[in-house]
C-alpha cells in the first residue's frame, strides 16, 4: 500500500471486510520518511514523545505546542500515510469547547488527518 494514502472510507471498508492494518508511532521527519516507504497504513504521533523524545517521566508534561512541533515534520515526512495526532493531557478535559479549540489547532497547524484523545466512555459527550 506504499504510495496510496488511505482514507477514513478505506479504513471503514477494511473493518467491514475484517481486514487488518498496521499502525506505528513516529515522532520526527526521519522516522516518518522511513515509514512512508513501508506498507504501514497509519502513523500516530503520540504524547509518548514526552518520554521517548523529551526525557519526561510521564506524558503529563507534554503540551499542545510540543505535539504540534512533532506532528508537523511527521506529516511532511510521510505524505502517503494517514497521520493521527495525539491530543495531550490537559488539552481537552476541561470542556467540549476546549477540545474543539485544541483539535482545531492541531489540524490547522499540522495538516494531520485526524486527532486522538483518551478517556473512553467518559469522553463520549466531548467527542459528540
Each language-model region and where it sits:
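Alpha/beta enzyme core
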Residues: 2-128
